[in-house]
Amino acid sequence: MSRLVVVSNRIAPPDDKKSSAGGLAVGILGALKAAGGLWFGWSGEIGNEDAPLKKVTRDNITWASFNLSEQDHDQYYNQFSNGVLWPAFHYRLDLVNFQREAWEGYLRVNSLLADKLKPLIEPDDNLWIHDYHLLPFASELRKRGVNNRIGFFLHIPFPTPEIFNALPTNTELLEQLCDYDLLGFQTENDRTAFLDCLAMQTHLSTSSDGEYTAYGKTFRTEVYPIGIEPEEIAQASAGPLPPKLAQLKAELASVKNIFSVERLDYSKGLPERFQAFETLLEKYPEHHGKIRYTQIAPTSRGDVQAYQDIRHQLETEAGRINGKYGQLGWTPLYYLNQHFDRKLLMKVFRYSDVGLVTPLRDGMNLVAKEYVAAQDPKNPGVLVLSQFAGAANELTAALLVNPYDRDDVAAALDRALKMPLAERIARHSEMLEIVRKNDINHWQEAFIKDLKQVTPRSPERELQNKVATFPKLA
């Protein structure tokens, strides 16, 4: 039976409870347990890159990790992955800081990873590579003679050609991505954007069985919306409340609660959300003294200027809004720039009347799905969701809004706060069915099934494809 080899920027080793808490780790571990295999990635430590791989084995899974030098980590991770790809793929070209040295560092680390992984690969292994840190990774493996099936899943959006083509290395990245056998995206929009970028750069041909050929390389593309563990979240949210949370719930029983949580990031639309809440208070004064909006946004990449700026902006806006609309005994907006235990947040989701999830751009946004899963089906809250989150393609029974339109968001909040129980139950039931169907295990099983059906590459087949395709002439 073929093994599965998973490669990601960071791994979740079995002895690290913090890193293994997320839903992605659950999905990857489920796939690894089913097939047996290897999880390969950065250790999270700055150190000697020539040091032997650190390996841990539990049952049929081995975790293998490596160190990065300070320079390589800075150029590969901070400067290029998060300084170029992250803002560009989230449609923020104004925040892109492209430096040729960072691009070279990004390629160097992908090459280093390929050198370290190649000796561990067995002939019939299936490889599954994750996210924007590793766009050129398959290309590096192919250079080293690896012809195994290699799949790739992009967790963030893929931008349209107008955005992507602004990157100085757009052509190189596209050609490198074509070295994957299967490219998975969160939404059809992302998949289409990738193919549109290719069609503008080179000759893109399509076969009757759904294969694409570009740059002399053949690959498949598909949509795999990532999911969550709905039953685990339902259990966590329904359990007894800790004493402090029980006291808080009692104190807030007289008001309706709007709740949001995400890491502090410019893609999440937090300043626009604060402005929309202010518009709600301005245009719908009947809610004064009767609602409370709590925004939890723990610091993310706090050493980056763009993140420092947004934190300062939110702190200023929260103070201004509370100063303008607050009353003795009523503070309309609570902004908490700190981390909370995930299981505790699921309980908070359950007693919130409105879940407000309005990113400006998001690959999926699992918080929206977690909010749905955490609700009491007999008395659920209402989800207000950005139309630019990948989750909006599935959770169509949410109140979908344009996060750039503060009046639209304010009107949706007013509607959510006034929504009758029967409508809340109907909307929640429809969304919960989708969340349960497209859970994290369905996601990984669908991807692995399709990857296994790919015909492995061979030198003869690649030569035929190169003869059949050629770049577009200028």
UniProtKB/Swiss-Prot annotation:
Keywords: Glycosyltransferase, Transferase. CDD domains: GT20_TPS. SUPFAM superfamilies: UDP-Glycosyltransferase/glycogen phosphorylase (SSF53756). Its EC number is 2.4.1.15. GO terms for molecular function: alpha,alpha-trehalose-phosphate synthase (UDP-forming) activity. Signal peptide: none annotated. Coiled coil: none annotated. Belongs to the glycosyltransferase 20 family. This is Trehalose-6-phosphate synthase. It comes from Cronobacter sakazakii (strain ATCC BAA-894) (Enterobacter sakazakii).
